[in-house]
Amino acid sequence: MTDKLIIFDTTLRDGEQSPGASMTKDEKLRIARQLERLKVDVIEAGFAASSNGDFEAVQAIANTIRDSTICSLSRANDRDISRAAEALKGANNARIHTFIATSALHMEKKLRMTPEQVLEQARLSVRFARNLVADVEFSPEDGYRSDVDYLCRVLEAVIDEGATTINVPDTVGYAVPELYGHFIKTLRERVPNSDKAIWSVHCHNDLGMAVANSLAGVMIGGARQVECTINGLGERAGNCSLEEIVMAVKTRKDYFNLEMNIDPLHIVAASRMVSQTTGFVVQPNKAVVGANAFAHASGIHQDGMLKARETYEIMRAEDVGWSASKMVLGKLSGRNAFKQRLQDLGVALESEADINTAFARFKELADRKSEIFDEDILALVSDESITHHDQEQYGFVSLAQHSETGERPHAVVVFTVAGKEIRGESDGNGPVDASLKAIETHVKSGAEMVLYSVNAISGSTESQGEVTVRLQNNGRVVNGVGADPDIVVASAKAYLSALNKLQSKADRVAAQG
């Protein structure tokens, strides 16, 4: 009999913890829809008790997504658990994921609790959560570095209280595959009631082994749930990569012999959406979703590919959503063709007004660029002004700049602040510097730019440039993304996008009080 492997995606929760990767409610909802198309089993939508913004995002996703289980993280206390349950009320299938640290280091230095106090807190929190929802996951934070005897006692107690999934995290990415696999196996063998719960793995990539450790937890340890993120997004070195786990299990079914619900045809679209939403560019040689993942430059390899694809390809690019023959749109393309392409790409805009706004932007772009590729469309709809233009504090209107060799560039930027048009102008070390300084003449954000990067969306000189700007202010870090055939305009859009996110974060912090 073939076992099922549950795919638990935490892009919207653990992935978002990567500095600068914070997402708006609308962005999270758009990604959640794509995860549902991908047929992810469980979507961890956020940490409902952490902020009003996170609560609203979890609530919106729970009210919208019908096929996937929707999960909220919570600490092991009644307030967090109650908040999670409230946010999940509209879900078809709801899960509360509660956690508390169990390693000696964390208990002593962070929690300042005794092992017995932690055990009791874990037990009571799972009992409380089970009174609110039928599906409860428990995680012993820093589980891999916990004492095995003590950890077995904790896990036995929470299963007795009704935990349906036991997730054992390698919180700091310290594990190596064989040892981690046997660690999971030992726990399952020594916890008397282990058969009453599904066992899960959650691995971080600090030593580059998150995927290998997760697969070892499955094959050696007997885990049947893997927690992962699109593109391996996550704090520090990231998390276990969903696309790599899925395609490893599918490609080597002869070895793993596991079934999954996942539809891999939507993997590339999910990867692009997360990358363009967060501004975290996928490296070209990234397995499965990198631009070079299916490219062959060696003459010997190319010759073999022409004779028989299987000589150098172990999986087909089109099986994960790479399109062999792309439909290219242009200025003569109509609204229906545009709407169909959005659907094919897994983009679901909430209203006809949003579609109309997106189509108007598409036509503007088509007047400047003869061919519109999928990447252009995804960049266009990832602009938050499409879906919540009424909520923007700052909006781009126009830009003019003058620069000559040997002269200091000058820029004039017209933008809106709370709906009112403002004209800023400034000199700078270059056209981009002048444009951003022109914005700051009125905004005076006090933010520090910690990252500025430019990426060509497609391969030609006619390509749009996609600019990512990362700003830091008072401990808050945000990414803004802007796209335009003019790199200077794209930079101004990205800067205003980042300022909007800084403002949104400040509002959420103020609301929390």
UniProtKB/Swiss-Prot annotation:
Provide the function of this protein. Answer: Catalyzes the condensation of the acetyl group of acetyl-CoA with 3-methyl-2-oxobutanoate (2-ketoisovalerate) to form 3-carboxy-3-hydroxy-4-methylpentanoate (2-isopropylmalate).
The reactions it catalyses are: 3-methyl-2-oxobutanoate + acetyl-CoA + H2O = (2S)-2-isopropylmalate + CoA + H(+)
Region ranges (Regulatory domain) = 395-513
Q: Where is the Pyruvate carboxyltransferase domain?
A: 5-266
Which InterPro entries has this protein been placed in? 2-IPM_HCS-like (IPR050073), 2-isopropylmalate_synth_dimer (IPR013709), AIPM/Hcit_synth_CS (IPR002034), Aldolase_TIM (IPR013785), LeuA/HCS_post-cat (IPR054691), LeuA_allosteric_dom_sf (IPR036230), LeuA_bact_synth (IPR005671), PYR_CT (IPR000891)
Q: Which cofactors must be present for this protein to function? A: Mn(2+)
Entry keywords, A to Z: Amino-acid biosynthesis, Branched-chain amino acid biosynthesis, Cytoplasm, Leucine biosynthesis, Manganese, Metal-binding, Transferase
**By its UniProt entry, which Pfam families does this protein fall under?**
HCS_D2, HMGL-like, LeuA_dimer
One GO cellular-component annotation of the UniProt record comes to: cytosol
The molecular function GO annotations come to:
2-isopropylmalate synthase activity; acetyl-CoA C-acetyltransferase activity; manganese ion binding
Q: Does the keyword Membrane apply?
A: no
Please give the biological process terms from Gene Ontology that the record holds. L-leucine biosynthetic process
Q: What is this protein called?
A: 2-isopropylmalate synthase
Tell me how this protein assembles: Homodimer.
EC id: 2.3.3.13
SMART domains on file: LeuA_dimer
Supply the gene name: leuA
